[in-house]
Amino acid sequence: MLTLHHLETSRSQRILWLLEELKVPYELKIYQRDAKTRLAPPELKAIHPLGKSPVITDGEITVAESGAILEYLVETYGHLGKKELANLTPAAGTEAHRQCRFWMHYAEGSLMNWMVMKLVFMTIPTQPMPFFVKPIARIICQQVQNKLVDPN
């Protein structure tokens, strides 16, 4: 039986979505973040050395990282879901397949870092802080976005 090790507020939500769309039977094991540190609990290290989520176990196979999990699920269970999901990826060896892989990994690797930075620098000025610091924080965050994040 496939098990999804789901950590609250993690990227495993998209794995849940795909499992449902593919109609794959699965068990859901839910983990809570530490209330103080917001880190994953140590129990996840017993599943995978990274100690993070999402992670799936499928029999003897353990797969970590959401992009790798999505690829594994499509390759292994893609035929089980809705008819229109049967061909989620183009045929292996084709240019379309290479492009699909590129965009999947670009989204997970290169793009995600910039998206997280943008989110952080957009959020900082909205957080509680002394009134005299707020304009400085806003200017610094805007400059970081303009000169570093947005050009990339």
Residue ranges and their predicted role:
Residues A137-N152:
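Amphipathic alpha-helical packing segments from all-alpha helical-bundle domains
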Residues M1-P135:
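GST-like domain detector, emphasizing the conserved glutathione-binding G-site
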